[in-house]
């Protein structure tokens, strides 16, 4: 299936902020590290028929580059260094790093190459896949339907929060990867800008063009890669946390907790890390139980939870965010990142549950053992066993 009218992507910055944040850290600390990543469809969608169209879009991405006004805008942000931005100015996507195949209807994608380059593919490639699939499946849906659905949700949201002090409710758009389309995401974000509780977007292109705050720190791959970068598996998570602080000592301090389960994370998250990081991000498992564990951990360390921020970003919608806000608002700072339920929430449109995750670093396996067993990713069962042993995980989690 080919002949999509034009390139889906128009800007190198049409990606999530944490990709550039991680890329700069990799550029400075792990320039020669090699990785492999793979696509997963967590649903039952057979997406292989779109392989040719996806390959065309991958080839078109080699023409994206950082434009001068984009370079100047990034230069004005406090955490990017000139050496990295000058390198990014010369960066081009290399389609040879991407293998796209149709395996009897199943879409297979494997990415290989230097981590500093491969790191950039995940978010825009997922956005491309999502937009292509929805273009063919739902040709009559688009911005109008998405905005109508959002307005309905906002009416319900207003009623749901009528008796609440919403002054500490902060919502972010995390919807780039699985958006219906670029145009839908932009329309949704522009509408949300009218709400006082909307604080920013993870999409750097939208943040620049709409004068919004870009949001994001690091992703699972940062912790996964350290499983092979670090000489000792048992200390690899601490090594990842320390390396991040080395790159960003006073900024971008929200740590992701579920690469090797929340319990294993908290064992590594001692007083120095807990003091220096501004907060934690939830991305799998029961959000209330997770938040209670986080607050209890801070209190045990003698840290006032009200000085820290919990970011919830796992399969959220507005009612779930309000429920969590009601539960936690008096005890800790809160932010909520909503993705698919904002940028691909259209009647009769089935969002894709798709990811691209790291599977190897320097030719050796890495794993994600999240707080939701269905999100576990690793090919190598022996490595999963070693990881469980190193982090004293009590429960067998099936590798997939």
Curated annotation (Swiss-Prot):
GO biological process: bioluminescence; NAD biosynthetic process via the salvage pathway
PTM section of the record: Transiently phosphorylated on a His residue during the reaction cycle. Phosphorylation strongly increases the affinity for substrates and increases the rate of nicotinate D-ribonucleotide production. Dephosphorylation regenerates the low-affinity form of the enzyme, leading to product release.
GO cellular component: cytosol
GO MF term list: nicotinate phosphoribosyltransferase activity
EC class: ligase
Signal peptide: none
Modification Phosphohistidine occurs at: 220
UniProt pathway: Cofactor biosynthesis; NAD(+) biosynthesis; nicotinate D-ribonucleotide from nicotinate: step 1/1
Result of changing residue 220 to E/N: Loss of ATP hydrolysis and autophosphorylation
Catalytic activity: nicotinate + 5-phospho-alpha-D-ribose 1-diphosphate + ATP + H2O = nicotinate beta-D-ribonucleotide + ADP + phosphate + diphosphate
Documented EC number(s): 6.3.4.21
Domain of life according to the entry: Bacteria
Swiss-Prot/TrEMBL keywords: Ligase, Luminescence, Phosphoprotein, Photoprotein, Pyridine nucleotide biosynthesis
Pfam families, alphabetized: NAPRTase (PF04095), NAPRTase_N (PF17767)
HAMAP family (alphabetical): NAPRTase (MF_00570)
Stated family: Belongs to the NAPRTase family.
Annotated function: Catalyzes the synthesis of beta-nicotinate D-ribonucleotide from nicotinate and 5-phospho-D-ribose 1-phosphate at the expense of ATP.
UniProt name for this protein: Nicotinate phosphoribosyltransferase
Organism of this sequence: Salmonella typhimurium (strain LT2 / SGSC1412 / ATCC 700720)
Gene of this entry: pncB
């Amino acid at each position: 299936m080919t002949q999509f009218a034009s390139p889906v992507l128009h800007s190198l910055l049409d990606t999530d902020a944490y990709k550039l944040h991680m890329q700069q850290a990799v550029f400075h600390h792990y320039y020669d590290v090699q990785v492999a990543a793979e696509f997963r469809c967590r649903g039952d969608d057979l997406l292989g028929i779109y392989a040719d169209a996806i390959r065309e879009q991958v080839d078109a991405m080699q023409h994206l580059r950082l434009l001068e006004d984009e370079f100047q805008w990034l230069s004005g942000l406090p955490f990017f260094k000139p050496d990295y931005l000058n390198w990014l100015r010369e960066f081009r996507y290399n389609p040879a790093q991407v293998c796209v195949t149709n395996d009897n209807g199943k879409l297979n994608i494997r990415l290989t190459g230097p981590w500093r380059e491969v790191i950039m593919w995940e978010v825009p490639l997922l956005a491309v896949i999502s937009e292509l699939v929805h273009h063919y499946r739902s040709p009559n849906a688009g911005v109008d339907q998405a905005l109508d659905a959002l307005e309905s949700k906002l009416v319900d949201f207003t009623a749901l929060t009528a008796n609440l002090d919403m002054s500490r409710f902060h919502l972010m758009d995390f919807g780039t990867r699985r958006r219906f389309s670029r145009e839908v995401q932009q329309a949704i974000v522009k509408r949300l800008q009218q709400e006082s509780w909307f604080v920013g977007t993870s999409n750097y292109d939208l943040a620049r063009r709409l004068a919004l705050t870009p949001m994001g720190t690091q992703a699972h791959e940062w912790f996964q890669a350290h499983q092979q970068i670090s000489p000792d598996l048992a200390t690899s998570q601490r090594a990842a946390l320390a390396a991040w602080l080395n790159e960003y000592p006073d900024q971008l301090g929200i740590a992701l907790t579920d690469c090797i389960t929340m319990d294993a994370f908290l064992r590594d998250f001692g007083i120095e890390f807990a003091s220096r990081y501004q907060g934690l991000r939830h991305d799998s498992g029961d959000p209330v139980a997770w938040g209670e564990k986080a607050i209890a951990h801070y209190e045990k360390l003698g840290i006032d939870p009200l000085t820290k921020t919990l970011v919830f970003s796992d399969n959220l919608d507005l009612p779930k965010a309000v429920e969590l806000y009601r539960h936690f608002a008096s005890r800790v700072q809160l932010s909520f990142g909503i993705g698919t339920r904002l940028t691909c929430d259209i009647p009769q449109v089935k969002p894709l549950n798709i990811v691209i995750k790291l599977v190897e670093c320097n030719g050796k396996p890495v794993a994600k053992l999240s707080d939701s067993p269905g999100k576990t990713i690793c090919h190598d069962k022996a490595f999963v066993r070693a990881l469980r042993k190193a982090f004293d995980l009590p429960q067998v989690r099936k590798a997939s």
